Amino acid sequence: MKHYIIVKFVEGTDWRALEKPIRGIFEQTLSIPGIHSVELRLSNSDRPNRYDLMIVMDMDKEALPAYDLSEPHLRWKSEYGGLVAKKAIFDCDED
């Protein structure tokens, strides 16, 4: 399945500077059984009604509970949650 995390950071956040440390956190999730890949995509738009960052994870559906409880996921939330104005989480099966 695909797990999407789409993030809009708080106005004034230099979110482009956060790419490397956020990527480092999410790359650690690759050690969780059933997580196959992680991609980070930065927005190419500065429009205020656009989201800033998209994280795309390819995983087995059964890996989602382990991911939710994992140290990288909890660290992502504790270190960056205060910088997030809004986010969308979307899961889907691949065709």
Regions found by a protein language model. Give the residues of each.
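Short, well-ordered beta-strand segments in beta-rich or mixed alpha/beta enzyme
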Residues: 2-8, 40-70
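Non-catalytic alpha-helical scaffold/packing segments enriched in small hydrophobic residues
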Residues: 4, 21-24
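Compositionally biased, intrinsically disordered low-complexity regions
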Residues: 7, 12-13, 29, 95
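Short, conserved charged micro-motifs
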Residues: 13-19, 63-67
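An amphipathic, aromatic/His-enriched active-site/gating alpha helix that lines ligand/cofactor pockets
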Residues: 24, 30-33, 58-90
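Glycine-rich beta-strand-turn "strand-cap" elements at beta-sheet edges
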Residues: 39-51, 77-95
